[in-house]
């Protein structure tokens, strides 16, 4: 998800992923106007059709140098963008809002049929308890490196499963982070 590419390069990547047998591709939304991302990702989805599922990472829960910042997307924008992605058949929208806006995330989730994913930047079990209590996500993505290690991840996976939610480990770090996620 980290790389930013032109639509033609993304289409080439998608074709290669299909040839290599991948079932899903995650793309990063990064434009100031998220509807520009909807347009680009819609073109890619139109190209691949049902041959490749596409999910989108909005990167709205990010923090840099240890300092949390408020996401650019508010609830209204997140709902509108979600509905636009719904219309083009995206599998899930990841990190569409600030990860500590529990009420806003819950409202977003109720406002769309699109699967909402997140939690990679939340840390420790008590934060996931709040996310689950508010029913913020369909897909919980704890990052083993960023949020407390193996034991914390196992606990969150069990909590998500108990609530009939999907848990999929997240990683955006080095090879050891990927290995730990498995």
List where the protein language model places each region.
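Short alpha-helical segments used as structural interaction elements across diverse proteins
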Residues: 7, 23-25, 42, 106
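Flexible, glycine/proline-enriched loop segments at strand-loop-helix junctions
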Residues: 1-3, 25-31
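A glycine-rich beta-turn/hairpin centered on an aromatic-Pro dipeptide
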Residues: 181-182
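Catalytic domains of carbohydrate-active enzymes, especially glycoside hydrolases
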Residues: 13-25
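Catalytic core of soluble alpha/beta enzymes
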Residues: 30-178
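Active-site beta->alpha loop and helix N-cap motifs at the rims of alpha/beta catalytic domains
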Residues: 1-15, 65
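Intrinsic structural disorder
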Residues: 1, 17-18, 51, 85
């Amino acid at each position: 998800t980290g790389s930013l590419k032109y639509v033609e390069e993304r289409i080439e990547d998608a074709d290669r992923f299909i040839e290599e047998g991948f079932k899903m591709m995650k793309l990063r939304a990064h434009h100031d106007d998220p509807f520009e991302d909807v347009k680009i990702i819609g073109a890619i989805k139109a190209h691949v059709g049902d041959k490749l599922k596409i999910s989108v990472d909005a990167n709205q829960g990010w923090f840099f140098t240890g300092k949390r910042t408020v996401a650019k997307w508010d609830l209204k924008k997140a709902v509108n963008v979600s509905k636009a992605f719904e219309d083009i058949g995206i599998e899930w929208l990841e990190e569409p809002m600030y990860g500590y806006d529990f009420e806003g995330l819950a409202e977003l989730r109720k406002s769309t049929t699109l699967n909402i994913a997140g939690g990679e930047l939340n840390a420790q079990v008590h934060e996931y308890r709040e996310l689950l209590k508010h029913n913020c996500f369909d897909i919980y993505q704890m990052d083993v490196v960023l949020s407390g290690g193996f034991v914390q991840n196992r606990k969150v996976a069990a909590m998500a499963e108990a609530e009939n939610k999907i848990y999929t480990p997240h990683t955006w770090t080095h090879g050891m982070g990927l290995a730990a996620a498995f």
